[in-house]
Amino acid sequence: MAYMNRSDLDKLKHENIFSGNIIEDAKEFVFGSRKIYTDSVDDLIELYSLAKYLNNENLKDVVIERMDYVCKYIGKDNWSTIYSFYKENGLRNSFLRQYINNNIEEICNTDQFLKLDVDSVCDILDNDEIVVTREYTILNMVLRWLENKRVNIDDFTKVMFVIRFKFITYSELTNAIEKIAPEYRQCLQDLYHMKITRPRHFDN
């Protein structure tokens, strides 16, 4: 990290890149003895962006530590924001993943899930520890995500690869085919016959 003083951070306020209170929190952490106590996910995300801007590894570590704590209180209203923070910064959090796996049906019924890109949907659903009653539940989640979307055939194939088709009945496949756009139907049939076999943690 290049040397800077308090006035350098004060000048940063005039650039309108970061919020004034976020800069103050960073300043007190870097030059004072104040710890990061905020429970606001949005504030922590902005603090982490500032830490990267300043190239301050200590501040980054403290923000991650605080986010790990806040993550223990994750819920359906903030899961996607927390998930995006970890994914976009190449970070992992076992509690976050456990929450997603155990609450996948509730999560996939949120508007936040429907707004995810294909990579995030695959990252979330292509997990052997997801707890569902049957594989058709996962297929329906993908179909719901695809509603009102037009993805190219490569992305369609990619997202369908999260389905373990060995555990999908032919009648369930037929029902799914009726729900998707015509241009995807042959691809879905082909994937079904490939019979992706990796099991999940089915909840009995």
Curated annotation (Swiss-Prot):
Entry keywords, A to Z: Early protein
Domain BACK: start-end pairs: 95-177
Stated induction or repression of this protein's expression: Expressed in the early phase of the viral replicative cycle.
UniProt signal peptide: none
SMART domains (UniProt xref): BACK
Claim: Manganese is one of the keywords in the record: no
Family from the record: Belongs to the orthopoxvirus OPG030 family.
Record-given protein name: Protein OPG030
Record gene name: OPG30
